[in-house]
């Protein structure tokens, strides 16, 4: 679920989507930034994360936060939910929360700066986001690239372009077949004639 031990983490979820599905990059947190979410437990997590809207932080957070917020529909254990508990949350078990109340979840988000115009725009919830990502050529190609890196044990080079194109075409021609993509990768020159330095 890509969350912390005791709370959701839409920032981490959004960063994962940006880097692994959209093939983007997010720089590390600068050393002079205290990257801690405020503990104002009377506010929702989205409200507490407003601190990331400061100009200094927002240049990176605008690429992550809107991608992670739709996943607020799931708690830190991955359980579906419609509301968020606020107040004194002393336990990870909702039935044991003391002086807690619930607020409606805001699962709106957006995709921006993705490099794929069809992917750009607002989403109401995680289902819309997943459908957008699933229909994206950029996400598919990023998926193929990650499969290449896994199966070949290295990053791709310019010489690997024919292998990546063939694997992508095999995946598409077989209706999204992982088996066809892996067969294409493992029968490619990039795999069969690897350098052993």
Residue ranges and their predicted role:
Residues 158:
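Short, surface-exposed acidic
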Residues 1-138, 144-149, 161-176, 182-197:
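Active-site substrate-binding loop specific to GH73 endo-beta-N-acetylglucosaminidase modules
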Residues 151-155:
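Core structural elements
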């Amino acid at each position: 679920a890509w969350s912390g031990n005791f709370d959701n983490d839409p920032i981490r979820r959004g960063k994962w989507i940006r880097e692994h599905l959209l093939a983007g990059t997010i720089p590390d947190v600068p050393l002079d930034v205290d990257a801690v979410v405020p503990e104002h437990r009377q506010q929702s997590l989205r409200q507490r994360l407003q601190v990331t809207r400061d100009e200094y932080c927002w240049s990176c957070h605008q690429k992550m936060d809107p991608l992670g917020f739709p996943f607020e529909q799931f708690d830190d254990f991955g359980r579906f939910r419609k509301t968020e508990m606020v107040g004194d949350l002393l336990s990870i078990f909702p039935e044991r929360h003391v002086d807690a109340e619930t607020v409606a979840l805001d699962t709106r988000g957006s995709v921006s700066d993705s490099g794929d115009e069809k992917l750009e725009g607002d989403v109401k919830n995680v289902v819309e986001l997943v459908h957008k990502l699933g229909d994206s050529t950029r996400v598919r190609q990023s998926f193929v690239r990650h499969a290449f890196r896994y199966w070949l044990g290295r990053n791709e080079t310019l010489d690997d372009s024919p292998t990546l194109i063939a694997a992508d075409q095999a995946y598409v021609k077989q209706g999204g077949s992982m088996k066809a993509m892996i067969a294409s990768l493992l029968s490619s020159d990039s795999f069969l004639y690897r350098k052993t330095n």
